[in-house]
Amino acid sequence: YKWQLIPATAYLEYERTGNRKIMEVPYDANRQALNTLMLAELAEGKGRFIDQLLNGAYMSCEMNSWVLSAHLPRQSSKRSLPDFREQIIDLGSGGYGALMAWVHYFFRKPFDKINPVVSLQTY
């Protein structure tokens, strides 16, 4: 899977035009890929998907927020770029957090063998 970057302009598109899809399509694809890779590795158990899981977990931790752009105007700034200084939650970010908790729970040990920084971020 090729992890998709969500640029600032994808978040801003909601504020500019009301288009949520430009941010949500890659967000949903990345989240679905992480979920699928987790289930595939749990089913197979051969380590074939660990590197991609590590990439997805690391990339997810690098995001300022897992909240959808259409819900970010709930921040005090009322803007659509995530402000790392203010934490808000929506159903999508709650689901993403739950997925990351499962990824951490099941794959902490294999991640630690590669580099413990990823497990520290997902904790």
Language-model-detected regions and their locations in the chain:
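Intrinsically disordered, low-complexity acidic/Q/S/K-rich activation/interaction tracts characteristic
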Residues: 18-19
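Low-complexity, Ser/Thr/Pro/Gly-enriched N-terminal "stalk/linker" regions
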Residues: 1-15
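Aromatic-lined, polymer-binding surfaces characteristic
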Residues: 24-123
